[in-house]
């Protein structure tokens, strides 16, 4: 396993995901309202509209699909063949996406440039304060949910896709 390649690929995947998420949330915070803490969602004057939910689903499919595609193609191109090394490579990819999300979106964007991402009608919600944001979503999501559940699951899916492609389309080594 090429650790440097896995790290660089993870950084590229993080740039794809976080750049896209930041652009979308700055364009219209309501498009990603379902990713906000429940207290902010409930404080919003109205729930997500059908259009906002549709944009959210399209964004999720395209961006997450693009990240998975990037990870799969890079892993295939890197010539990795065993379950363990493919899984570890995928885990590195997705854990970097996770921590970049935490530092770039939760810490930088949401805490330093809060005015850009506030959902209209929730401006005075105390959850936007750094301490509350980290307690409600930042720490639980990025230091518990993602490292122990989401990243292993995403890594398993990516590993399965890579191994299936290798089995079906690549000659035995």
Residue ranges and their predicted role:
Residues 2-20, 85-103:
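Alpha-helical transmembrane segments
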Residues 13-21, 63, 67, 97, ...:
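Alpha-helical transmembrane segments of multipass membrane proteins
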Residues 22-44:
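Membrane-interface helix-loop junction between the first two transmembrane segments
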Residues 29, 33, 130-153:
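Individual transmembrane alpha-helices with interfacial aromatic-anchor signatures
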Residues 43-63:
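Interfacial helix-start motif at the membrane-water boundary
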Residues 56-73, 140-155:
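Core segments of transmembrane alpha-helices
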Residues 106-126:
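Juxtamembrane non-transmembrane "cap" segments at the membrane-aqueous interface
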Residues 157-173:
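Juxtamembrane boundary at the C-terminal end of a transmembrane helix
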């Amino acid at each position: 396993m090429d650790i440097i390649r896995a790290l660089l690929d993870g950084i590229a995947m993080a740039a794809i995901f976080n750049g896209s998420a930041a652009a979308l949330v700055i364009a219209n915070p309501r498009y990603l309202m379902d990713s906000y803490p429940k207290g902010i969602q409930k404080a919003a004057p109205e729930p997500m509209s059908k259009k906002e939910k549709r944009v959210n689903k399209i964004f999720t499919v395209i961006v997450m699909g693009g990240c998975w595609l990037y990870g799969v193609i890079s892993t295939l191109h890197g010539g990795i063949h065993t379950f363990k090394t493919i899984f570890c490579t995928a885990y590195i990819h997705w854990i970097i996406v996770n921590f970049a999300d935490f530092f770039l979106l939760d810490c930088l964007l949401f805490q330093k440039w809060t005015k850009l991402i506030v959902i209209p009608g929730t401006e005075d919600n105390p959850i936007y304060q750094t301490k509350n944001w980290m307690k409600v979503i930042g720490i639980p999501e990025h230091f518990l949910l993602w490292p122990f559940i989401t990243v292993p699951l995403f890594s398993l899916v990516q590993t399965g896709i890579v191994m299936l492609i290798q089995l079906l389309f690549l000659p035995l080594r």
